[in-house]
Structure formats: C-alpha cells, structure tokens
C-alpha cells in the first residue's frame, strides 16, 4: 500500500485535480504489485503456485487439459481486461513506475503500441501530465536511434510496425528495437482478423526476452474456443477481468 501511495504521488505532481484510484483500479495495481514482487524475488515459487492452481481449477471445471502448464516464458506478460472508461490509461502510468521499482530487467527500449494516431496523441498528453517521459514516433529512424530508457516511452501505432521494410513511408521494421523491450499495448488486437494475427506476431517479436503490459476492453472479440492458442495465451495473462 505504501508503494501504491508513492506511485500516486509521482503521477499527481503535475495533475489538477489529483487522481484518486477507484476500487477496481486499486485492485489492478495491487495485483500487479504482488505479481511483480513474486516474479522478481520468488519466481520458482510463483511458477509452482500457478501450476498448482491450474491443476486444481482444471479438475474442478473439467478443462480437459486445453491449457498447458505455465512455463517461465508465460510469466513475461500480464493483461488487464477492463471496460471502456475504467481508467486503463492511468494504470499504464502506474505500471511504468511499478516495473522500474522492481527492476525485472533494465529495458533497452520502452514502447507503447496503440491502434491509431489519435490514441497515440492522447496517450502522449496523459503521460506528460503524469510526468512520465515519452515521445511520439514521427516517421523517421532518427526518432528511434538512441531511444534508451532515460528517454522514456516511445509511442507508435501498430500499423507502422512491419517485419521487413519495403520502400519508403513511415513504417519501421521491428528488428530496430534490439535487446529486451518493455512493451505497453493498448487495444493492440483491433483490426481485421488477418491483420490481428500479423500484428500479434510483430508484438511477440518485440516482446521476445522482454515484458508486456497489455490492456483492452474488447478481449472478448478475439477469445474463442476456435482459436485455442490465443485463448490459452490470455487465459494465462489476464490478471484482472473488470469487463
């Protein structure tokens, strides 16, 4: 609780009126705080407890084994399924401070992925209000070079990320973000089904060896028994469902 008060103090330094967490926001922050503490200090125990829970839950609800055991790689992503208007943006600001407090690793890049330019600008304005260093991707590689942790969060639309750049334009290949990335994803699955699958592959490349905070109000649109891989991924990642 003391840590959470400290995060609020940091993001409220420039804000008027001051932010107060609603109960579901507090729970999201608290669950994340506990999770990151376990991940940093007791990873083997965390993995064992998750698999024990999965075994017991699967037995009680007859899951039929469609969710495999947790492995270490599953621990590098947490997701928030929260309704529109529930303050997901604010949680992102606190998640930023939580990750830096626990120092899971020192990120080579910090990236916020959004579905469109309008949301990118909105995120940039709100992050600045909270005193979180950030900048928008302006369409040039010069915006990327040297974009290390001390320079803050780079905000970019998912539509501008590609696996391999062909020709000119504002797109950028994910390979330029080398190393361990701290990735924030806002509604990153929006789009046509084929687009969503392509974007998911690009996100996974960016997140390789890194860590992901993802939030959405519409996970239900992509979660179905027909797509068992995605269903399993988010069944393991969602830390709070307030949809």
Model-found features: residue ranges?
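Short loop/turn elements that form and flank the Walker-type P-loop nucleotide-binding site
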Residues: 35, 74, 106-107, 149-150, ...
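Conserved Walker A/P-loop ATP-binding site and its immediately adjacent core
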Residues: 90-94, 105-131
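Conserved H-loop
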Residues: 85, 115, 217-218
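Inter-Walker segment of RecA-like/P-loop motor cores
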Residues: 128-167
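Conserved pre-motif I regulatory segment
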Residues: 1-81
């Amino acid at each position: 609780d003391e840590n959470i008060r400290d995060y609020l103090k940091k993001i409220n330094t420039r804000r008027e009126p001051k932010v107060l967490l609603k109960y579901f926001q507090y729970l999201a922050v608290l669950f994340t705080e506990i999770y990151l503490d376990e991940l940093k200090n007791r990873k083997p125990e965390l993995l064992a407890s998750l698999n024990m829970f999965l075994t017991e839950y699967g037995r009680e609800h007859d899951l039929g084994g469609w969710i495999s055991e947790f492995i270490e790689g599953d621990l590098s992503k947490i997701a928030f399924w929260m309704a529109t208007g529930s303050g997901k943006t604010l949680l992102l600001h606190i998640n930023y401070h939580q990750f830096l407090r626990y120092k899971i690793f020192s990120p080579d890049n910090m990236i916020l992925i959004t579905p469109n330019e309008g949301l990118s600008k909105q995120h940039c304005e709100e992050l600045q209000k909270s005193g979180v260093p950030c900048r928008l991707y302006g369409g040039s590689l010069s915006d990327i070079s040297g974009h290390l942790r001390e320079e803050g969060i780079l905000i970019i639309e998912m539509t501008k990320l590609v696996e391999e750049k062909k020709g000119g334009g504002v797109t950028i290949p994910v390979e330029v973000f080398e190393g361990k990335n701290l990735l924030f994803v806002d509604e990153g699955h929006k789009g046509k089904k084929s687009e969503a699958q392509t974007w998911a592959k690009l996100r996974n490349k960016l997140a390789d060896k890194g860590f992901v905070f993802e939030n959405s109000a519409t996970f239900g649109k992509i979660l179905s028994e027909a797509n068992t891989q995605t269903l399993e991924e988010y069944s393991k990642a969602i830390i709070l469902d307030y949809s």
